[in-house]
Curated annotation (Swiss-Prot):
EC id: 2.7.7.6
Gene name per UniProt: rpoA
Molecular function in Gene Ontology: DNA binding; DNA-directed RNA polymerase activity; protein dimerization activity
Name of the protein in its database record: DNA-directed RNA polymerase subunit alpha
GO CC terms, sorted: chloroplast; DNA-directed RNA polymerase complex; mitochondrion
Length: 339
């Protein structure tokens, strides 16, 4: 972290992207600015965002590979230049982009002699490869080579104990960290009592999402983390009665719509987050797991889409409908919702 004195002016708190570039298919860079901040606030925001970006962003990667009857990961397979361990390490480096949840199956099935790259992986429709040229193995002889793969979306670094799997299935230490590095610097501006701080935030990603997308997701995760503190505890209500209850923010969905109507503006559905809906914790968590963050995301889903969400029930569907019906114009619901 670097501190410098620079000239600046006091204005409403705002952020913007001051630099964005693509260094390669697996290296994106973005530089953002947030200002003006009071003294000490830049450190608070910078530390929180850096931790959230490095540890809370979800990524998709290959977590398991099955070769068939292979006694151990240091084995070699006739007609293949690389050992099983080297192939596993190459699979670990494959960068995937998806919105899937749970475990999905993929496979590789080719005939040599030829080079195997990430382009040869047969993936589910919801998954795509960031860099199709990433190497996997080199077949030096005319052999049939097949691998069954498992793909999972998670966060952080996951390890599994190594065993001699009789069926030839081997775990891959999953690195579900789309953000490769984060750095922030703080610049001071102004004089005397008018001194403010400017926060510069640099983000590098692996190409599975852009730095702007990573910043958005990290910010949403931090907001979700602090939501319980935004609502004052109801007087006379015991902890036991509230411990399983989702607490909405102070600025509720209803209040947001009322303000918009007073200002005679259209309703920006992509700016209303599901955090502001009066949803139960169960329904809210189901939607978040399905990457439904805004009202626009929700209204773009059909009933079939919602019912395919893990743990989503008919009661959740009815609860969502009742909430929207209470606050949204009925013609908007008919146009947007198919259930």
């Amino acid at each position: 972290m670097v501190r410098e004195e620079v000239a600046g002016s006091t204005q409403t708190l705002q952020w913007k992207c001051v630099e964005s570039r693509v260094d390669s298919k697996r290296l994106y860079y973005g530089r953002f600015i947030l200002s003006p901040l009071r003294k000490g606030q830049a450190d608070t925001v910078g530390i929180a965002l850096r931790r959230a970006l490095l540890g809370e962003i979800e990524g998709t990667c290959i977590t398991r590979a099955k070769f068939g009857s292979v006694p151990h990961e240091y084995s070699t397979i006739a007609g293949i230049e690389e050992s099983v361990q080297e192939i596993l390490l190459n699979l670990k480096e494959i960068v995937l982009r998806s919105n899937l949840y749970g475990v999905r199956d993929a496979s590789i099935c080719v005939k040599g002699p030829r080079y195997i790259t990430a382009q040869d992986i047969i993936l589910p429709p919801s998954v795509e490869i960031v860099d199709t040229a990433q190497p996997i193995a080199n077949l030096t002889e005319p052999i049939d080579f097949c691998i069954d793969l498992q793909i999972k979306r998670d966060r952080g670094y996951q390890t599994e104990l190594r065993k001699n799997y009789q069926d030839g299935s081997y775990p891959i230490d999953a690195v579900s960290m789309p953000v490769r590095n984060v750095n922030y610097s703080i610049f001071s501006c102004g004089n005397g009592n008018e001194k403010h701080e400017i926060l510069f935030l640099e983000i590098w990603t692996n190409g599975s999402l852009t730095p702007k997308e990573a910043l958005y997701e990290a910010s949403r995760n931090l907001i979700d983390l602090f939501l319980p503190f935004l609502h004052a505890e109801e007087e006379g209500t015991s902890f036991e009665e509230n411990k399983n209850r989702f607490t909405p923010p102070l600025f509720t969905f209803q209040k947001r719509l009322t303000n918009l109507k007073k200002n005679k503006k259209g309703i920006p559905l992509n700016c209303i987050f599901i955090d502001q809906l009066e949803l139960t914790s169960r329904t809210y968590n189901c939607l978040k797991r399905a990457n439904i963050h805004t009202l626009l995301d929700l209204l773009s889903k059909t009933e079939e889409d919602l019912m395919r969400i893990d743990s989503f029930r008919m009661e959740d569907r009815k609860h969502i409908w009742d909430t929207l019906e209470k606050h949204l114009p009925i013609d908007l619901l008919k146009n947007k919702l198919s259930f």
